[in-house]
Regions:
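P-loop NTPase catalytic core of nucleic-acid-dependent motor ATPases
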Residues: 1-65
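Hydrophobic alpha-helical membrane-insertion segments
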Residues: 41, 82-83
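Short amphipathic alpha-helical segments and helix-helix/interface helices
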Residues: 36, 86-87
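Feature primarily recognizes SF3-like P-loop helicase cores of small DNA viruses
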Residues: 16-19, 46-47, 57-82, 88-90, ...
């Protein structure tokens, strides 16, 4: 949340908020998607997208400049071939966008941060890119009724003004990659080796 608030405040500078929490549960009805949407106060809900499409890089970049929170709902639906594009989008801090029927590009700051949900535990396909995702197992139904947006965002703003760190250190990134191993999808070769030699 600190990374999101820093991104919205324009504090991220040359480094964007490149980490996305992914809420994971094999059980339906845990309120994962509802929680993601509930993070946005009602006055900002129009800046929330819950169906990020990775079919057009230009469209995705426009969303980075115009939205506040992009939910990669059902994260496992994204093909492995789209992961390089997603990782690139997540690290972008400035965007060069050309609107339809215009000849010149405009440089716009990135505003949006990412979040995601999944019903599968084997959702990460690139072990080198797992530091971009903070996979969190949801073990029970999330109570979305008690979110006090004014308090949350006031606290985030205060922490940022006091200089709170909103990025991971190299050591924390290493711990994150280790944590995410339980959410890693095995390749076909790994599956065959595991089946033959366990």
């Amino acid at each position: 949340m600190l990374g999101l608030a820093a991104q919205w405040s324009g504090l991220a500078g040359i480094h964007a908020n490149s980490v996305a929490p992914i809420l994971v549960s094999q059980e339906q009805g845990r309120q994962k998607s509802t929680f993601c949407k509930s993070l946005m106060p009602m006055v900002l809900r129009r800046y929330y997208v819950d169906n990020l499409k990775l079919t057009s890089q230009g469209q995705a970049e426009r969303l980075l400049a115009e939205m506040g929170l992009l939910n990669m709902d059902e994260f496992d639906k994204y093909a492995e071939s789209k992961m390089p594009l997603l990782k690139n989008l997540m690290q972008m801090s400035d965007l060069n966008i050309r609107k339809a029927y215009q000849q010149s590009f405009r440089q716009l700051p990135r505003v949006a941060s990412f979040i995601g949900t999944s019903n599968r535990f084997d959702l990460l396909t690139d072990p080198t890119g797992s530091r971009r995702f903070l996979c969190v197992e949801v073990k029970g139904k999330i109570d979305c009724s008690r979110i006090v947006h004014k308090q949350i965002y006031a606290q985030l703003k205060q922490e940022l003004l006091k200089g709170a760190r909103y990025w991971f250190t190299a050591e924390e990134e290493h711990e994150l990659k280790e944590h995410n191993k339980m959410f890693q999808r095995r390749s076909i070769m790994e599956e065959v080796l595991y089946a033959c030699f366990r």
